[in-house]
């Protein structure tokens, strides 16, 4: 549980920082929502069935995860509590102003970055943790590169 909460906090902080960088502002709730998305997206390649799944498939699943979390949290934060954290009602194809096709596509293309960031955070935090790699087990010397993830993404690997 401690590992999940650590990743949740790390990924939430990364999300808030990116939102401030690109939007100029964020909301405290985005620490929770962004962290949840990071943990759930990171969980994709923790499932044995997806260990070697193509990055494109992981990106599709990840984008769907983010859309579901965004929709549910948007309904709670924006519609129910009236916090007005975001509003996509002026976007074509929006659903209750909480999600829209344009941002779904954006999440799809951002997903390789999210996958890489979560895997890199795991590597940085637990690189030499024997509980993760077993007694005497050794992690890779460095995490894989963001360039290689996008290379696999655009080549369908």
Predicted region positions:
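Aromatic-rich, lipid-facing transmembrane alpha helices and their immediate juxtamembrane interface loops
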Residues: 1-157
């Amino acid at each position: 549980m401690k590992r999940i909460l650590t990743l949740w906090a790390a990924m939430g902080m990364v999300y808030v920082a990116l939102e401030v960088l690109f939007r100029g502002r964020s909301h405290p709730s985005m620490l929770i929502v962004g962290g949840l998305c990071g943990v759930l997206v990171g969980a994709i390649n923790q499932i044995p069935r997806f260990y070697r799944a193509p990055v494109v498939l992981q990106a599709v699943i990840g984008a769907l995860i983010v859309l579901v979390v965004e929709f549910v949290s948007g309904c709670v934060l924006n519609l129910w509590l009236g916090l007005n954290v975001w509003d996509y009602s002026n976007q074509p194809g929006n659903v209750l102003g909480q999600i829209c096709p344009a941002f779904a596509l954006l999440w799809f293309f951002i997903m390789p970055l999210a996958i890489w960031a979560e895997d890199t955070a795991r590597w940085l935090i637990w690189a030499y943790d024997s509980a993760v790699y077993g007694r005497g087990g050794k992690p890779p010397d460095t995490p894989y590169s963001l360039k290689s993830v996008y290379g696999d993404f655009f080549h369908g690997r």
